[in-house]
Amino acid sequence: MDDLVWFVRDRRYQGSLKHSGVIIPVAHRETVFDLTGAEVAATFRLLRRVKAWMDAEFSPDGYNVGWNCGRVGGQELFHARLHVGRRKWIR
C-alpha cells in the first residue's frame, strides 16, 4: 500500500481464490485507461509485492491478473481495479 494505490483482499473466496484481491487507485478512476502514469507505476510496484507475499504464503501454481473495463467488459463497479488471484491445482 502507498499513497496512490492499495491492495484489498477479498476474504469471501474459498479454495484456490482465498486471499485473492484487487489493487485499486486511491483516487477515483473509472477504468485502467484513466490512471495517471504515476498510478500505473505504483500499481505494478505493488503487484510485485503482492506476488512476493502470495508466493511466500501460499506457493501458488499460477496467477490470474486482469482488468475489467466497461459494462460489456465485465466491469460491475466503476472504479478501476486490478484483480490478482492466486491459483493452485486441486488434485
Each language-model region and where it sits:
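HIT superfamily nucleotide-processing domains
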Residues: M1-R91
